[in-house]
Amino acid sequence: MIGILKKVFDVNQRQIKRMQKTVEQIDALESSIKPLTDEQLKGKTLEFKERLTKGETVDDLLPEAFAVVREAATRVLGMRPYGVQLMGGIALHEGNISEMKTGEGKTLTSTLPVYLNALTGKGVHVVTVNEYLAQRDANEMGQLHEFLGLTVGINLNSMSREEKQEAYAADITYSTNNELGFDYLRDNMVLYKEQCVQRPLHFAIIDEVDSILVDEARTPLIISGQAQKSTELYMFANAFVRTLENEKDYSFDVKTKNVMLTEDGITKAEKAFHIENLFDLKHVALLHHINQALRAHVVMHRDTDYVVQEGEIVIVDQFTGRLMKGRRYSEGLHQAIEAKEGVEIQNESMTLATITFQNYFRMYEKLSGMTGTAKTEEEEFRNIYNMNVIVIPTNKPIIRDDRADLIFKSMKGKFNAVVEDIVNRHKQGQPVLVGTVAIETSELISKMLTRKGVRHNILNAKNHAREADIIAEAGMKGAVTIATNMAGRGTDIKLGDDIKNIGLAVIGTERHESRRIDNQLRGRAGRQGDPGVTQFYLSMEDELMRRFGSDNMKAMMDRLGMDDSQPIESKMVSRAVESAQKRVEGNNYDARKQLLQYDDVLRQQREVIYKQRQEVMESENLRGIIEGMMKSTVERAVALHTQEEIEEDWNIKGLVDYLNTNLLQEGDVKEEELRRLAPEEMSEPIIAKLIERYNDKEKLMPEEQMREFEKVVVFRVVDTKWTEHIDAMDHLREGIHLRAYGQIDPLREYQMEGFAMFESMIASIEEEISRYIMKAEIEQNLERQEVVQGEAVHPSSDGEEAKKKPVVKGDQVGRNDLCKCGSGKKYKNCCGIGK
């Protein structure tokens, strides 16, 4: 084990040594860069760009470009990057992750590779976790880049399309990860290429890279729209589920919250709905509705998981107990609960476009990131993103005191000890940061401190703007700050001058299931060589301890007669906790890896569709593409109607009927003509007739209008079929894990069936486009329209408004319907005369 660790450490050391040589080259250039005037320094940017056009690479320019940025940062920001920051910049430029401890100046470090890569003119994206940090960094570091003659843009959710286009056209764009992903999806839903906002994805530097690529990796970005589905099935499924009995008709696993029909339940369903086989492909929707109705009745409880308020179902947040108005369960569960509670069933939302951060960021030509804690997830970064983690040494040695965990018998004893420790440190004037896993824990400690008369601030992820002020005060004498884990990342706690020799105390009230989050909390203290102390308080009732068998330890504490106020301080327990954390991290990594394998199936399909859409948008003339689609459609139709071996069994009449209905006009192709030909010869005369009809259609209108008509048809069909396909893939994914019970690999099945569904969708697209082109009447006022309005949805944000408005059509009145004027006559005999 020690050998392996040494080996790993040596690899990092070798990288550091190699980068140290480049740092020495940069230092050597300082004497020639320092005497330059501001204008001469700015002129270097143009010089670098010219050298790139003459064949030099960004790697060749690195030492000189870094020296220029260092000098500019000293003049503009009053900050001169240290040698270790130059190393961090080199690691980022090489497409790796720089692990730099809190307070080591990651934001300034990023300016070096950002400047160097922006010289190519292809655009650099600097990615942050929230808009407050994006604006702060764009404003502060933007001064430096603008001084050197580069343009800086900021991409916010509230911006118009034109503002976004301007932000992305800049050399450097600051943005949140959510907004980048949503813009990519929206760009692949637009109907005119002028509406796209992003350029090809060149280079991204992700701040807090572990938060975005690990913690949020499993959360998909979704653009959803209203599905045009009937609510009747929800009512029927609800009525049926009410007749079922627990254990007999369905089984429920309390641990996993998994509920499923038994054999008896399946038989009951087949009888109730008068069908032979519930698992037949044509009953996929019915099975989905029954499963969701079961979940609504068995798993979801009123006033625990949701409340009924003003005739609506409102979700209750399991972590905070707060109501989450406007949020809805997906995949029809919300509608199933509405049916259960007898309130109005609202339309199910339908996924129009979706992507995970894993797949979005893997599309960049080059990707890098920085964080204080990445080494524990090194395997994941290397395997999934092809990025190595390089631990950058600190500028000054760390002198922080990390103490062994204190373990108490009960939660009550633990919290009493935590509060006592805070009170004692507060009296000495030492600033204290208390880290909690959940918001309710922070509120409990807050109440206990209020009773003791200790003034304190609470920091959680609700207010990013206020966050900066609270963090700024957190290092002052006697300050007490309670923070949930992720809150305050990206902002430094700077110590007040009067307590520089004491340092910050960090108290953890519980171990998180990830070592990385614990390390982030520890890293808040002892920044830039300051003193500091960190201490974790645990109890046998903590979730991590409960999950990994602390019963023996609790029994031992009872036998020893230890009460609530006596902690155990044991390296053995700390090691046990750490191995439990490693197990959880391993499970989480496996889950993310599996998610990626499933998501890759949809990714490959998405890339094909988006690439074709792009080609259609940029193409001036689609006629060649459409003729190819018609040829495929005809060949499939011929093969389908002539697949029997005996000629007499061929359905030539069916083929002629199909062609007349979908592609040609009556009499264009005659049955007796086709009977004289072999199957492989039939397609040719049919296609020749199709092209003749296509030419006739061309003569009826100006060429420009015909070309636009083709685009309108292609977009309408492709977008409709693709959204239906995503929905179908969702349903397939939901039920695929059941195949494992039949000793079949669910992933392999998903890949095979997903591919078959995709092939079928392509055939359906080709057929429908051919039919519309040949049979549709062409309107004079042609306009490309969206199939359905999309809205950006990300489970970790409060939902983001879509930029587009739906096209609303007026109600159509049939000629034989009653006239809307109220005369009682039919429309054709009243207001519709002559229409």
From Swiss-Prot:
Which stretches of sequence are listed as region Disordered? 788-807
UniProt GO BP: intracellular protein transmembrane transport; protein import; protein targeting; protein transport by the Sec complex
| Residues reported in the UniProt entry to bind Zn(2+) | 819, 821, 830-831
The Enzyme Commission number assigned here is: 7.4.2.8
Q: Which cellular component, as a GO term, is one annotated location?
A: cytosol
Query: What does this protein need as cofactor?
Result: Zn(2+)
Key words of the record: ATP-binding, Cell membrane, Cytoplasm, Membrane, Metal-binding, Nucleotide-binding, Protein transport, Translocase, Translocation, Transport, Zinc
What is the membrane topology here? Peripheral membrane protein
Tell me the NCBIfam families matching this sequence: PRK09200.1, PRK12904.1, secA
Quaternary structure annotation from Swiss-Prot or TrEMBL: Monomer and homodimer. Part of the essential Sec protein translocation apparatus which comprises SecA, SecYEG and auxiliary proteins SecDF. Other proteins may also be involved.
Q: What is this protein called?
A: Protein translocase subunit SecA 1
